[in-house]
Amino acid sequence: MRRAGLGEGVPPGNYGNYGYANSGYSACEEENERLTESLRSKVTAIKSLSIEIGHEVKTQNKLLAEMDSQFDSTTGFLGKTMGKLKILSRGSQTKLLCYMMLFSLFVFFIIYWIIKLR
């Protein structure tokens, strides 16, 4: 951006009647330097923030991959258990299934009771 009369036509070292023009020019330069430094610090802050976000994203992606593998193994385990329960329920062992369910409920009730007393 050019400003009229700020340092134009003044030979170097000759401040004669144009001293005010040089001081205005240097004031603009100082302001530009100050604004440039402010902008540089803001850009540096944004850069460091984006680097930190990148590290956090990598960490979260690693955590999600681990959770995915754990969910897959749990799904397989539950699938096998449900398959065994289906086989057990299809057979003539309904009395055994009933006892197993009652035992499970009893164990869960005892665990609930112990936790509740704490």
Curated annotation (Swiss-Prot):
CDD domains found in the cross-reference section: SNARE_Bet1
In-chain residues carrying the UniProt-annotated modification Phosphoserine: 50
GO molecular function: SNAP receptor activity
Ranges in the topological domain labelled Vesicular: 116-118
Taxonomic superkingdom: Eukaryota
One Gene Ontology term, aspect cellular component: transport vesicle
Subcellular location field: Endoplasmic reticulum membrane; Golgi apparatus, cis-Golgi network membrane; Golgi apparatus membrane
Disulfide bond positions: none
Family membership: Belongs to the BET1 family.
Primary role: Required for vesicular transport from the ER to the Golgi complex. Functions as a SNARE involved in the docking process of ER-derived vesicles with the cis-Golgi membrane.
Self-association state and partner proteins as the record states: Interacts with SNARE complex members GOSR2, SEC22B and STX5. Interacts with LMAN1/ERGIC53. Interacts with STX17.
Name of the protein in question: BET1 homolog
Organism, as annotated: Homo sapiens (Human)
Annotated gene: BET1
